[in-house]
Structure formats: structure tokens, C-alpha cells
A protein has these predicted regions:
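Channel- or pocket-lining gating/hinge segments that regulate access to a cavity or pore
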Residues: 169-242
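Soluble non-transmembrane domains of integral membrane proteins
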Residues: 1-169
Length: 242
């Protein structure tokens, strides 16, 4: 939503850490890897530690739809979870409909500072689907580009203490395809304005006709703007289209 400066996204949250306390001997257990599937097994059966990640810039929704936890014999833990969320991110629409946006989702670990838990980017599990069958396409936008990074920052608490937190930032760079907006709003308004300018080439003695054309042009542009106002972003500052 451009008016609320929010965006909706779906994705897979993948994490990997090592906990030697969870190591086991396959010859004793009889299995090579240990799996916990679904929230019942994860919440009720799994007894190890895991980083509880939350969306710091959440704006109205963060749903967890499926989870798989895999533990290898040496204590490596692989956490995979499907998520759907709405995040708050700054929109700059001054160049609408030729604008570009940087949408960011910021994840943090609940209850731990960077001295205890440090987040790192894993290039092997970070990316966006780009094949023909699963390619991400957004109406009125060109194909998005994804990047990720770790941000370190220090919040100040009311008792004067400075904290040190680590956050995982996922950034989606998108560029708007202006053709729909120009075809629907931009080009028709330009034609109406040009027709209104035709009064300057009319006979000077035809004052009444010139006034009629001018008022008709103004009313047509205003009516057209009102008719298609729902297709334009509801923001207070001006854009290229007005």
C-alpha cells in the first residue's frame, strides 16, 4: 500500500547454526539426520535452543505457515520456515510513475544482543526465484532484485545503557512500469490540455467559443482526474502526474 507505506511479501526463512549439545551418533540412533516437521513437533518435541526471529518493521501481519527443522550428527541445525508478512518501508513517490523503491524487511533475534547472537548472511540460501515456472512477477512493476545484509546498531535505553543489536536486512529493489498509468491517465490528460490550447489559434472575435472550449477542457481534465483518482497513489506531496 503506497498510502500506508507498506508492502506484502511471502518467502522462506532459512537459518543455520551449530549446537554441539544436539550431536548424536547415527550408529546408536539408527538414523542419519533428525527431523522435526510441523509446529507440533517443533514446539512440543524439540528441546534444543533456537533463535526466535521476528520482523522488526512488521505492519499488521506476520504469519508462519510451515516449518522443518533438520539436525545432522555433528550438531548442525537447519531451520526452514514459510512466512507471509506485511512490512513498513519508506516510499518516495515524487517521480511517480517513473519511481523506484527500495523495500526492506528487517529481521532481529528476540531477547539477544549482538554479543550473544550474531546474524550472518548465507549466500547459499539467499535469493529470489528466477526460473520460468516460479519467476516473481508483480503487476505494474518490473522484475524485482533482491539483496541481503547484516546491520549492526545500538539502541539507547531509558536507564542510559547502550545496546548492541544485530539485524538481518532483506532489500527488494523494484522499478515501476509506467505504461499502464500513462495509458490510463497521462496521455489522455495531455490530449485534453492540447485541445484546450487550441483557443490561442482561434479567431480573436470568437470570444464566446474560446471561453466555452477553455471551460470544457478544464472540466474534462478535472472529471477525468476524479474518475481515475483510485488508480493514483493517495499521498499529500506532488508527483510528476500532479
Amino acid at each position: 500500500s503506497e498510502a500506508d507505506e507498506t508492502f506484502h511479501f511471502e518467502g522462506v526463512l532459512s537459518m543455520h547454526w551449530k549446537d554441539p549439545r544436539l550431536a548424536f551418533d547415527p550408529a546408536v540412533t539408527g538414523y542419519d539426520d533428525l527431523y522435526y516437521q510441523g509446529y507440533y513437533q517443533f514446539n512440543e518435541v524439540f528441546t534444543g535452543w533456537w533463535p526466535q526471529v521476528f520482523l522488526a518493521n512488521e505492519a499488521g501481519g506476520f504469519e508462519q505457515q510451515g516449518i522443518v527443522l533438520r539436525i545432522t550428527p555433528d550438531g548442525n541445525v537447519y531451520y526452514t520456515e514459510e512466512i507471509e508478512a506485511v512490512a513498513k518501508s519508506h516510499f518516495n513517490l515524487a517521480r511517480y510513475p517513473f519511481d523506484r523503491q527500495q523495500l526492506a524487511a528487517i529481521f532481529e533475534v528476540l531477547g539477544f544482543e549482538s554479543e550473544e547472537v550474531v546474524l550472518r548472511v548465507d549466500p547459499a540460501s539467499s535469493g529470489i526465484w528466477d526460473d520460468d515456472e516460479h519467476k516473481v512477477e508483480i503487476p505494474q512493476w518490473y522484475s524485482p532484485k533482491l539483496s541481503s545484509s547484516v546491520v549492526e546498531y545500538g539502541p539507547s535505553y531509558l536507564d542510559g545503557r547502550d545496546g548492541h543489536l544485530s539485524a538481518f536486512r532483506v532489500q527488494i529493489d523494484v522499478e515501476r512500469d509506467p505504461r499502464y498509468t500513462l495509458r490510463l491517465v497521462g496521455f489522455p490528460v495531455i490530449i485534453f490540455v492540447i485541445l484546450s490550447w487550441s483557443v490561442f489559434w482561434m479567431d480573436r472575435s470568437s470570444v464566446g467559443d474560446r471561453m466555452d472550449i477553455t471551460f470544457m477542457g478544464i472540466l474534462t481534465v478535472v472529471a477525468y482526474q476524479i474518475m481515475f483518482s483510485g488508480s493514483l497513489p493517495k499521498i499529500s506531496y506532488p508527483t510528476i502526474l500532479g
